[in-house]
């Protein structure tokens, strides 16, 4: 859906050589961030103490993913877009998972570039508006 909307409206996805980079990071979110963080939430947040092996496994993999993201954000303002530093659909797909960092027992201070990026995206009015929906308001954790 993100790809379709970005292409249809010509926003949040590069049309130059950085397009492939954006799509690679989007696919990384779908193949790594989402599945692993989902499992981390299951074992660490919703069912703690039920499987020590699973808790340790997904905490370890979660931290590896944070390191990869932090290394990328050491070099660029946003996840993709190269040196232009544009906010893209890759950021949109990854950020909500990072917003739940407490559920997978991650301290964003341990990943300073991720934390900087997290706050940058949090400051966007559209992001705040999306999280403050009537009758389903959830605080964005900082």
Language model region names:
Residues 27-28, 58, 97, 117, ...:
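Tryptophan-centric aromatic hotspots in well-structured domains and transmembrane helices
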Residues 2, 59-70, 115-118:
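Hydrophobic core segments within long, regular secondary-structure runs in both alpha-
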Residues 71-83, 125-130:
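Surface-exposed helix-capping loop/turn segments at secondary-structure junctions
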Residues 9-11, 63-78:
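Short amphipathic alpha-helical segments and their helix-coil junctions
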Residues 30, 34, 66-71, 122:
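Structural signal for well-ordered, non-membrane alpha-helices
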Residues 1-63:
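GST-like domain detector, emphasizing the conserved glutathione-binding G-site
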Residues 32, 36-41, 79-110, 115, ...:
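GST superfamily/GST-like fold recognition
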Residues 127-142:
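Terminal-tail/helix-coil boundary detector
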């Amino acid at each position: 859906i993100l790809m379709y909307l970005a292409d249809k409206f010509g926003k949040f996805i590069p049309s130059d050589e950085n397009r492939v980079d954006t799509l690679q990071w989007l696919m990384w979110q779908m193949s790594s961030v989402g599945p692993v963080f989902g499992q981390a939430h299951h074992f660490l947040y919703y069912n703690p103490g039920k499987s020590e092996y699973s808790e340790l496994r997904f905490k370890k993999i979660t931290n590896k993913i944070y390191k990869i993201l932090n290394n990328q954000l050491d070099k660029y303002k946003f996840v993709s877009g190269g040196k232009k530093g544009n906010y893209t659909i890759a950021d949109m797909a990854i950020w909500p998972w990072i917003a739940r960092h407490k559920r997978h027992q991650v301290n964003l201070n341990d990943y300073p570039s991720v934390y900087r990026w997290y706050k940058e995206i949090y400051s966007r009015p559209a992001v705040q508006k999306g999280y403050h929906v009537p009758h389903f308001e959830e605080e964005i954790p900082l």
